[in-house]
A protein has these predicted regions:
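Short secondary-structure capping/turn micro-motifs that flank functional sites
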Residues: 25-27, 46-47, 74-75, 166-167
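Conserved acidic functional residues
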Residues: 20, 41, 132-134
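Catalytic alpha/beta core domains of metabolic enzymes, predominantly
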Residues: 50-165
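Short glycine/threonine-rich loop-to-helix capping motif typified by GTGT followed
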Residues: 143, 171-178
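Short beta->alpha connector loops at strand-helix junctions that form conserved
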Residues: 39-44, 67-70
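Alpha-helix-loop-beta-strand connector modules within alpha/beta enzyme cores
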Residues: 1-19, 54-64, 114-129, 175-186
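N-terminal active-site wall of soluble small-molecule enzyme domains
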Residues: 1-39, 47-50
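Glycine-rich, proline-tolerant flexible connector loops at the mouths of alpha/beta enzymes
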Residues: 1, 164-173
Length: 186
């Protein structure tokens, strides 16, 4: 029922809704619920044996699909996932830059490593690239800074986490903005 609630919420505010899919069952459920956009998460992108069944499940389906970068800084894995989806006939593709695992303590939760999405843009100029500043920042106070850097680098959009009361969010509470904070940032 969660996907239907999400779809109802989107209708109530007049916005399209998106959700992450990691398996063919997720794809089937999202399509059945009428979800508008799908995304493949960073931990799925790293595994071609996970991406291929998702690509196969999307054959003949006209839905936008966004692909997050893999957790490790490997542009070939990212490109490989995008190419598998494209080969399956998914034409509405976008990439999401969410940063890379930081093996050393850093001010960011995930290292931005901006040169990788810049190289992706060089290789596939027509591919929209969205930035997920929430996952890069890891803390809400850094989200505006990361967002501005992404826009300065001509990213095509932002995927920002927002919650009415982030401190009680069930996941990633530290990186979520309150709606008013999101409004000010935008």
């Amino acid at each position: 029922p969660g996907l239907y609630w999400l779809k109802d919420a989107g209708r109530a505010v007049g916005l399209p809704v998106t959700t992450e899919v990691a398996t063919t069952q997720h794809v089937e459920q999202a399509l059945k619920a009428g979800i508008d956009v799908l995304w493949i998460g960073a931990r799925t992108t790293v595994n071609p044996f996970s991406v291929q069944p998702i690509a196969d499940a999307l054959k003949g389906v006209d839905i936008p699909v966004m692909v997050k970068n893999p957790i490790n800084p490997d542009i070939e894995l990212w490109l490989g996932a995008l190419e598998r989806l494209n080969a399956a006939g998914v034409n509405k593709l976008a990439a999401i830059h969410r940063g890379f695992t930081a093996y050393k303590k850093s001010r960011f939760r995930n290292k931005p490593n901006w040169k990788i999405p810049i190289e992706l843009r060089r290789r596939v100029p027509s591919l929209p690239i969205i930035c997920d500043p929430s996952h890069i920042a890891g803390t809400r106070k850094l989200v505006p800074e990361v967002s501005q850097t992404a826009l300065d680098l001509t990213f095509d959009g932002l995927m920002v986490e927002s919650h009415i009361d982030p401190d009680v969010a069930l996941s990633d509470a530290k990186q979520q903005l309150k709606p008013a904070e999101l409004g000010r940032m935008l």
